[in-house]
């Protein structure tokens, strides 16, 4: 089966990160749509999701007059807080098929400000 451009790009980025995965350095996978953004910290050795956060959660969704970039910051802050509660600080940033620009860049910078290392 022939892969399209998006699938090739995803396999190229995520595949490299899965090869170097270890239990001390986890993978942060991010996904975004036109309205929402979500992220999860994954342990590729055990194949489990340790922490996740999304803009569709009730407390974030209920905010009025907040643009998508601000929502991205809020989700990143909440994810960093959840990760610190589970004593996770070192991660690989898996941007997937998305360019490191806009909401993805703001998300990554906010994570760095809140103590995550990648």
UniProtKB/Swiss-Prot annotation:
UniProt cross-references to CDD domains, sorted A to Z: Ribosomal_L18_L5e
Disulfide-linked positions: none
A GO biological-process term: translation
Pfam families (alphabetical): Ribosomal_L18p
GO molecular function: 5S rRNA binding; structural constituent of ribosome
Origin: domain of life: Bacteria
Keywords assigned by UniProt, alphabetized: Ribonucleoprotein, Ribosomal protein, RNA-binding, rRNA-binding
Cellular component terms per the entry's GO annotation: cytoplasm; ribonucleoprotein complex; ribosome
Gene3D superfamilies: 3.30.420.100
Family assignment from sequence similarity: Belongs to the universal ribosomal protein uL18 family.
Function: This is one of the proteins that bind and probably mediate the attachment of the 5S RNA into the large ribosomal subunit, where it forms part of the central protuberance.
Subunit structure: Part of the 50S ribosomal subunit; part of the 5S rRNA/L5/L18/L25 subcomplex. Contacts the 5S and 23S rRNAs.
Listed PANTHER family: 39S RIBOSOMAL PROTEIN L18, MITOCHONDRIAL, LARGE RIBOSOMAL SUBUNIT PROTEIN UL18M
Record's protein name: Large ribosomal subunit protein uL18
Organism of provenance: Pelagibacter ubique (strain HTCC1062)
Gene: rplR
